[in-house]
Amino acid sequence: MKNEIRAVRRVAAPLIAGSLMAASAPALAQDSPPPPKLEFAFEEIVTLGQAIPVGKTPLGTRNIIPITGGTFEGPGIKGTIIPGGWDWQLQRSDGCTHIKADYMLRTDDGVVINVINAGALCPPGEGSAPPRTQAVFEAPEGKYGWLNRTAFIGTLELAANAPGPAVRIRFYKAM
């Protein structure tokens, strides 16, 4: 019986896939959508603690940077960054640093939102892009539910006027 089911699956899967592709061909043949545009969403000033060196791993040299707080503000959203998040940084052999931060925001009206922000920072030079990140937000449905359904690109730089180590991240909605 199991062999018969496997045989049916081997035959049925390509047929189903082909049918789906044929059915969607007219939609794919239409004009391509316009390229995305970016719209400013909000800016964060993220304060950082002292790096905790993990050491050399098979993937590169790992450091953990504590996120100690900060603020954020943009049209319709404002609040503080809850201390206790982390930025896991991996220094790669090509000189670039892969970052992946996981932290929480608290809006002025008390809503807590999770942020996972990742990107690569490469030394300036030929073929290097400016620091960009891609953020994913997890917010309760309601006033800030739009964060769950939007693609975000971030810019990253040192926050020059901060009282201690900090970065400025500007998030843009891809429209």
Feature locations, PLM:
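Beta-strand-enriched cores of mature, soluble protein domains
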Residues: 29-175
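Bacterial N-terminal signal peptides
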Residues: 13-23
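Bacterial N-terminal signal peptides that target proteins for export
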Residues: 2-15
